[in-house]
Amino acid sequence: MAFRKKADYILLQKPDILIIPECEHPDKLKFDKDTPEPTDIFWCGTNRNKGLGVFSYSNYKFELVDNHNPDFKSILPLHVTGGQTDFTLFAIWANNPQDKDGQYITQVWKAIHYYDNLLLDNKTILIGDFNSNTIWDKKYREGNHSPVVGKLAAKKIFSTYHKFYGYSQGAEQHPTLFMYRHQNKPYHIDYCFASTDFIENLKNVEVGTYNDWTQYSDHKPLAVTFELPQNKN
């Protein structure tokens, strides 16, 4: 379902920032008069019906980093400013069928090497649809899910879900995808990785349920709440 058709339901969560994979171009976003308007939008994609949208419903503003590499389709490195703290946000929809090396997690693997200098142990978040899980690691593939997790951990950047609930990678108990909306096909493929300063201020992580969200999407929202110090820039 298009974002414009489910925005009212999503916005009941009162997000500061929304990451929406498979999102229509902003020109197509026609909301009802009572629907809150975003204060800033950043969108990329080659298909006007399915791109990657980043929305602010707060004081945060987005700016693409100078060394953005468009070869990593739908991985957006953004400077986020104007809110409680400035930080670097990697909005992710890992899906590039043109890359013969691998269209899903391999995209993230390549991107975190290219943007290595931006992956700091503070003020860094990577979030979105990684289309991956440790259970799908392949023996002869370098860019598996587990090496991605390992490289980020070496930078002191960790999965908020796994930190909050204490599960290991591959042992998640809250699916973020029910493939084809079938309840018997649950997978955890959406993540929010955050640097230690965010992890230290992690307040809550919640995954939407099958019953609440299936009418809107095969994916379930991953909502992450940080309790940040005021005006920490």
Residue ranges and their predicted role:
Residues 1, 23, 94, 130, ...:
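Active-site metal-binding loops of divalent metal-dependent hydrolases
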Residues 1-35, 230-233:
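N-terminal, active-site-proximal structural segment of metallo-dependent hydrolase catalytic domains
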Residues 2-5, 25-29, 97-99, 133-135, ...:
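Active-site environment of divalent metal-dependent phosphoester hydrolases
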Residues 17, 107-189:
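Metal-dependent phosphoesterases centered on the DNase I-like endonuclease/exonuclease/phosphatase
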Residues 22-96:
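Structured beta-strand-rich core segments of catalytic domains in phosphoester-bond hydrolases
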Residues 47-63, 81, 179-201, 226-229:
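Conserved beta strand-loop-helix elements of the APE1-like EEP
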Residues 90-108, 134-139:
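Surface-exposed cleft-lining segments at the edges of enzyme active sites
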Residues 215-233:
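Surface polyanion/phosphate-binding segment centered on an Asp-His-Pro turn
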